[in-house]
């Protein structure tokens, strides 16, 4: 007798599928934590300090070359006597350093390294522009401008160091800088000056204030420099050009209020006549 067996639970002719193979769970990814030892931290601090010494040494060399050339121009007995040229030459001399500062900032944004030849070109062009100030004004005015601009640069550098050192002091300094410009504007507004004098001084103070903020930012960039940049010579020269141009433009802006008694009275009537001719033609 033939026995016929029926498979319960499955239709006839259907092949039973095998379950997919189950792979074992993969272990979690291993996180590699770079542990910086005390010796490595000390080595990086020393490397950063030496890099900053070289940086500010380069800036001091550029500034010394500019000051020495300006003193030589001041010793020349000849002076610019044409009123218009004497009073406007410092303004035209400011345009070239501002253009060079923009180019140095562009190099900083593009992460392009600076070269020794570029530093020499920057120093030469800027020195020629600044030295013309010595042919336009008295020695006392130039010396006062150098002293005052140097004090402002040292003050901005000190604020940047304090901001990098302590978080609470950083917030206090930011609050101080926020209220400083309105206070200076209020001081200018209450003075018994002519309207054009107030406008020019307010614009000059605004430019100096903005340049102080830029100088603080550049100094903080130097203090918070990442070790991944390897402290190369190209980065050093590029940063030195930025700091040098900040100091030069600060000096040129400080010249404006110091020379106010010379050129404010001369051009007050001319500005008034020009405005009257433009608006009442």
UniProtKB/Swiss-Prot annotation:
Q: Which InterPro entries match?
A: Bax_inhibitor_1-related
Q: Where is this region: Disordered?
A: 1-30
Subcellular locations according to the entry: Host membrane
Show the GO cellular component annotation of the record.
host cell membrane; membrane
Q: Where is the composition biased (Pro residues)?
A: 20-30
What family is this? Belongs to the cytomegalovirus US12 family.
Under what name is this protein listed? Answer: Uncharacterized protein US12
Task: Supply the gene name.
Answer: US12
């Amino acid at each position: 007798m033939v026995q016929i067996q029926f498979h319960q639970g499955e239709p006839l002719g259907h092949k039973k599928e095998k379950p997919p193979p189950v792979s074992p769970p993969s272990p979690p990814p291993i996180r590699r934590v770079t542990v910086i030892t005390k010796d490595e931290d000390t080595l990086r601090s020393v490397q950063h300090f030496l890099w900053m010494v070289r940086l500010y040494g380069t800036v001091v060399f550029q500034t010394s070359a500019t000051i020495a050339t300006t003193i030589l121009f001041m010793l020349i007995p000849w002076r610019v006597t044409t009123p218009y040229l004497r009073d406007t030459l410092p303004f035209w001399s400011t345009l070239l350093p501002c253009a060079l500062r923009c180019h140095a900032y562009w190099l900083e944004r593009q992460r392009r390294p600076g070269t020794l030849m570029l530093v020499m070109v920057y120093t030469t062009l800027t020195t020629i522009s600044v030295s013309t100030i010595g042919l336009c004004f008295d020695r006392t005015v130039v010396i006062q401008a150098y002293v005052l601009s140097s004090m402002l640069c040292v003050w901005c550098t000190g604020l940047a160091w304090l901001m990098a050192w302590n978080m609470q002091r950083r917030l206090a300094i930011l609050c101080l800088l926020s209220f400083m410009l309105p206070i200076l504007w209020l001081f200018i507004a209450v003075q018994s000056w002519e309207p054009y004098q107030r406008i020019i001084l307010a614009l000059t103070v605004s430019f100096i204030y903005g340049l102080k903020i830029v100088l603080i930012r550049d100094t903080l960039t130097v203090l918070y420099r990442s070790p991944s940049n390897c402290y190369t010579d190209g980065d050093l020269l590029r940063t030195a050009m930025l700091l040098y141009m900040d100091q030069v433009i600060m000096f040129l802006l400080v010249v404006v209020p110091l020379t106010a008694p010379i050129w404010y009275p001369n051009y007050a009537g001319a500005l008034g006549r020009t405005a009257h001719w433009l608006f009442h033609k």
